[in-house]
Amino acid sequence: MDGEDVAALVIDNGSGMCKAGFAGDDAPRAVFPSIVGRPRHQGIMVGMGQKDSYVGDEAQSKRGILTLRYPIEHGIVTNWDDMEKIWHHTFYNELRVAPEEHPVLLTEAPMNPKSNREKMTQILFETFNVPAFYVSIQAVLSLYSSGRTTGIVLDSGDGVTHVVPIYAGFSLPHAILRIDLAGRDLTDYLMKILSERGYTFSTTAEREIVRDIKEKLCYVALDFDQELQTSSQSSAIEKSYELPDGQVITIGNERFRAPEVLFHPGPLGLEAAGIDQTTYNSIIKCDVDVRKELYGNIVMSGGTTMFPGIAERMQKEITALAPSSMKVKIIAPPERKYSVWIGGSILASLSTFQQMWISKQEYDESGPSIVHHKCF
C-alpha cells in the first residue's frame, strides 16, 4: 500500500469533542460532540424514519427524545459499540470517505490500557478495513505541533487533564500525572455558582448555555484574592449575557471564580493538586538533568487552557515553585484547542513517517498486539 498518493485521515477522539480531517490540512474539517444517542422509547417516532442511534450534533439536537451517552470517559474509551458508531459517523457522514482507501492515525490518552490500544487496532482493521493504521499519544502530538520534541505538556480538555513530560519525542511514563478535573467540571461548577446568584440552569440544554458563557466570559485571575477584592468594590468586571429567550443576565466574579478551580480544586470537593502544582510534581519526578528543558518548554494544549490569563498565571505559579535561578517559559499557542489534531496532521504527512504505519498485511500476520511494537 503506497501512502503517498492518498491523504491519511487524522482523528482525535476527545471525551467531549471528536476532531477529524485530512493529514496535511491546518485544521480539522469536522468537529462534533463525542456522543451517541438512542431513542428512549422504541416506536415513538414510527413513520418518521427513526434510526436506532444518532451521533454528534444530531444526537445533541434530538436529545429530548434520546438517552445520551459519552463513550469516552476521562479520555479513555469505555464503550466500544458506541465508539464504533462514532468512527462510522466520522468516516461516512462527516468526512465522506471510504475508510478502506485511507491510512488512519488515531490519538489516545496517556497511559491508555494495552487492551484498549489492541481493541482500537482490531476495530479499525477488521470492521473498517483500513489499509494502514497508527496510534499516537495526544500530548506528544501537541508538543510536535508547537515545533518541539522535548517539553512538558499540560493537556486539558473536556473530560480529563494530563501533565506529560516528553524527552526527545518519547513520553516519560513514570512522571505522567492525570487530574480528573477538566472542562465539564468547570461548566458544572459555573452552573452551581450562577444558581447562588439566582440563575438556575438544570437541563442539558441549559448546560450548553452555561458552557457558552464559560467559553465567552470566563478568565483566570493573576491574583485571585486581589481580583475578588477589586470585584467587590467595583462593577468593572461585570458582563451581561443574553440568553436564547432574550433574558439578559449579569455575571461578575463568577467569571474568574469558575476557572480558579483549575488551580485550587477544593470547591469541587477534590483532594487533587491544581494544574500548577501537578505540573511541578511531574517535573520533579523526572531526572534532574532534563528538568531545565522541561521548565523552559511548558506547552499548554486543549480547550480548557483557552481562558485568557491562564498562561500568565501559570508562569507566576511555576516560577514561585521552581528553583530561583530557573528560567520558566509557558507556551500557549493560539490554536491550542486543536493542537493534538494539528500535531497528528503534521506527523502523518511527514515523508519519514510513512514507514511507521502498521499495514493491513502486518496486522494480518501479527494480530492486534503489533500496535505495541510499532506505536510507542
UniProtKB/Swiss-Prot annotation:
Keyword ATP-binding: yes
Superkingdom as given in the UniProt entry: Eukaryota
UniProt cross-references to InterPro entries, sorted A to Z: Actin, Actin/actin-like_CS, Actin_CS, ATPase_NBD
Gene Ontology MF annotations: ATP binding; hydrolase activity
Subcellular location: Cytoplasm, Cytoskeleton
Signal peptide feature range: none
Catalytic activity: ATP + H2O = ADP + phosphate + H(+)
Keywords: ATP-binding, Cytoplasm, Cytoskeleton, Hydrolase, Nucleotide-binding
GO cellular component, one term: cytoplasm
EC number(s) on file: 3.6.4.-
Principal EC category: hydrolase
Gene3D superfamilies reported for this sequence: 3.30.420.40, Actin, Chain A, domain 4
Alphabetical list of SMART domains matching this protein: ACTIN
Protein family per UniProt: Belongs to the actin family.
Role of this protein: Actins are highly conserved proteins that are involved in various types of cell motility and are ubiquitously expressed in all eukaryotic cells.
Name of this chain's protein: Actin
Species in which this protein is naturally found: Ogataea parapolymorpha (strain ATCC 26012 / BCRC 20466 / JCM 22074 / NRRL Y-7560 / DL-1)
